[in-house]
């Protein structure tokens, strides 16, 4: 499980202001910000915040731990991608996804699929809008959730109300969003047509393939 697993909310990343004042956090934040000519106070605060949060989520609570954590170049690159993703879209859902990906890069074996997916995810996140995330959320829900509790109409309706409807409001239908996701290798167009009923049957066989 990752840093946010099972909490239902964001972790509180500091008990006192000195976390944001850490010399290592300041150095990593400044290194990122120095790439840009115009930096607002708001952006400075956002980058210091997400930098401190990134170290906290991988279990680094002292500067010696932080220095050791960013020794590998790959981790430094991942941290910069976390900063870039959050700077582009300083939203709670982007924060949660970026921190989970950073955690996976640091703690999962380099040869694991989870590690490699996290590396690629952080690279494309700065280019994803809220609409892109809505599309991906619904795709992942229906293709991979395979919720074993959906055994009748009542439980499925509860599932839809809880997990699907929050994404439906303003759901993007414009083709460019889907083309962009394909270009960024977040999705891939299939050569054959797959009916929605088939996806539901594969994901929730107890409900949509029941023959009792």
Task: Tell where the protein language model's regions lie, with residue ranges.
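Eukaryotic partner-binding/assembly regions in large regulatory complexes
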Residues: 15-123
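Short amphipathic alpha-helical interaction segments
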Residues: 92, 165-212
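Non-catalytic, well-ordered alpha-helical scaffold segments
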Residues: 92, 96-99, 115, 119-122, ...
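Short acidic/histidine-centered micro-motifs embedded in hydrophobic/aromatic stretches
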Residues: 100-101, 139, 184
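Short amphipathic alpha-helical interface segments
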Residues: 123-166
């Amino acid at each position: 499980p990752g840093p946010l697993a099972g909490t239902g909310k964001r972790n509180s990343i500091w008990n006192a202001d000195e976390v944001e004042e850490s010399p290592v956090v300041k150095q990593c934040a400044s290194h990122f910000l120095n790439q840009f000519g115009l930096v607002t106070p708001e952006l400075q605060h956002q980058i210091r915040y997400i930098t401190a949060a990134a170290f906290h989520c991988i279990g680094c609570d002292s500067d010696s731990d932080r220095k050791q954590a960013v020794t590998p170049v790959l981790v430094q690159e991942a941290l910069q991608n976390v900063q870039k993703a959050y700077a582009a879209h300083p939203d709670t859902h982007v924060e949660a996804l970026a921190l989970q990906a950073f955690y996976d890069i640091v703690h999962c074996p380099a040869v694991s699929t989870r590690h490699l997916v996290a590396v690629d995810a952080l690279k494309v996140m700065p280019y994803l809008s809220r609409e892109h995330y809505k599309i991906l959320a619904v795709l992942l829900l229906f293709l991979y959730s395979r919720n074993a509790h959906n055994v009748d109409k009542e439980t499925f309706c509860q599932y839809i109300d809880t997990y699907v409807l929050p994404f439906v409001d303003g759901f993007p239908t414009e083709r460019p969003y889907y083309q962009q996701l394909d270009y960024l290798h977040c999705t891939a167009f299939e050569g054959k047509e797959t009916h929605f009923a088939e996806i539901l049957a594969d994901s929730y066989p107890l409900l949509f393939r029941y023959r009792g």
